[in-house]
């Protein structure tokens, strides 16, 4: 029994010595009192653009010409996505606080570009020159936030008369816009109505053959009163009856039937 207790103490002796050695380490008070740097301080802030008040001057500078040239700012941009099929909408925003997402959109990647209704040269790059339609965000690659700002700035620039678009005039073709076509002109009357013939040919009177007439005479001998000629040109018109007389006759007919 005593041997087992002694072995247990010998096993725990090195652990106790290490624990005591750890307490003997001196830690300076300065390291314990200083605050750890916050995430906002550790991250580099977004640089401030010198063209914030006058953003149109950046598009006239040599720096812009060296970087973009005569092409739009979104010409060389390629979206970064997972898989072979790109998502059907761009990201909501590229900058959240001081954090800039990887591969930001063409507007967010250059801090000197500012969406403003007075920056006409920048807005013209996102509008079709032929139709005046704003390019879709999937075509230009800008995020949803910047696309919304672009749409508002373009509409405001049009209201102020700064941004206009020209639609070329196309001369209409005579064949497409002619009013002499049969489908758009007055319908002429049928030739049969002009000549006085009936609309359908089987309504016209035709003299039956003499052989057929002789057969019918033999068949209905003694029952035929007289031979009828061609039908009259116009049927006799019946005199119109007054509504009161018609209602009176309609009421008296059932009584007479009884």
Swiss-Prot record:
GO BP, one annotated term: mitochondrial translation
Modified-residue entries (Phosphoserine), positions: 38, 49
This protein's record includes keyword Cell membrane: no
Residue ranges, annotated region (Disordered): 218-258
Keywords assigned by UniProt, alphabetized: Mitochondrion, Phosphoprotein, Ribonucleoprotein, Ribosomal protein, Transit peptide
Cellular-component GO terms for this entry: cell junction; mitochondrial small ribosomal subunit; mitochondrion; nucleoplasm
Record field: compositional bias (Pro residues): 229-242
Classification via InterPro entries: MRPS18B, Ribosomal_bS18, Ribosomal_bS18_sf
Tree of life domain: Eukaryota
Localization terms from the record: Mitochondrion
Extent of Polar residues compositional bias: 248-258
One Pfam family linked to the record: Ribosomal_S18
Subunit structure: Component of the mitochondrial ribosome small subunit (28S) which comprises a 12S rRNA and about 30 distinct proteins.
Name of the protein described by the UniProt record: Small ribosomal subunit protein mS40
Source organism of the structure: Macaca mulatta (Rhesus macaque)
Taxonomic lineage of the native organism: Eukaryota, Metazoa, Chordata, Craniata, Vertebrata
Gene: MRPS18B
């Amino acid at each position: 029994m005593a041997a087992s207790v002694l072995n247990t103490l010998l096993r725990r002796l090195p652990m106790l010595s290490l624990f005591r050695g750890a307490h003997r380490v001196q830690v300076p008070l300065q390291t314990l009192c200083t605050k750890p740097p916050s995430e906002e301080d550790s991250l580099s802030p977004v640089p401030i653009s010198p063209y914030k008040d006058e953003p149109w001057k950046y598009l006239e500078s040599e720096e812009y010409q060296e970087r973009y040239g005569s092409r739009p700012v979104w010409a060389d941009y390629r979206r970064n996505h997972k898989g072979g099929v790109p998502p059907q909408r761009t990201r909501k925003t590229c900058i959240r606080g001081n954090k800039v997402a990887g591969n930001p959109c063409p507007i967010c990647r250059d801090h000197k570009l500012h969406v403003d209704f007075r920056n006409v040269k920048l807005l013209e790059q996102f509008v079709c020159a032929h139709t005046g339609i704003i390019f879709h965000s999937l075509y230009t690659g800008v995020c949803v936030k910047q696309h919304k700002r672009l749409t508002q700035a373009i509409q405001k620039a049009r209201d102020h008369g700064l941004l206009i678009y020209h639609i070329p005039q196309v001369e209409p073709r005579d064949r497409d816009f002619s009013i002499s076509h049969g489908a758009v002109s007055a319908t002429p009357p049928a030739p049969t109505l002009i000549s006085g013939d009936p609309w359908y040919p089987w309504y016209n009177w035709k003299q039956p053959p003499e052989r057929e007439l002789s057969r019918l005479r033999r068949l209905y001998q003694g029952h035929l009163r007289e031979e009828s000629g061609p039908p009259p040109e116009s049927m006799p018109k019946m005199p119109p009856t007054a509504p009161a007389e018609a209602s009176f006759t309609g009421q008296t007919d059932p009584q007479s039937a009884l």
